[in-house]
Regions:
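Short proline/glycine- and polar residue-rich coil/turn motifs
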Residues: 63-70
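C-terminal interaction-tip segments
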Residues: 1-33, 37-40, 46, 90-108
Length: 108
């Protein structure tokens, strides 16, 4: 069993939910930080998780960000299971970006 720290970056090209990170089929993951940066103006970001065991999307964070500012929308650790998907949706296609800090736990 190996623990690996990873970063997943977010820089939207569409206003639809975009996959930022997918948990490998042989691992679990703990999301420790979801940091979003708004360069200017007012933007909305939504964070969701697709639970692969139930094929259901759950919104886990919502941020109305007036820039310029940086905010962390993860208010605590988020545990993801095998094949779960973390997605971020933005109200605009530019001026907002971010990073997700993840501890991936390989179960092999």
């Amino acid at each position: 069993m190996a623990n690996v720290y990873k970063n997943a970056f977010f820089d939207p090209t569409t206003t639809a939910a975009e996959t930022v990170y997918t948990v490998p089929s042989n691992a679990r993951a703990i999301v420790q930080n979801i940091q979003l940066t708004n360069e200017s103006g007012s933007k909305v970001a939504k964070v969701s998780v697709t639970d692969s065991s139930a094929t259901t999307d759950y919104q886990i964070a919502y941020a109305d960000i007036t820039g310029p500012t940086i905010c962390n929308v993860a208010k605590g650790p988020v545990v993801l299971e095998e094949n779960d998907v973390l997605k971020i949706e933005s109200s605009v296609t530019s001026g907002i970006s971010g990073i997700v800090s993840i501890l991936e736990i390989n179960r092999e």
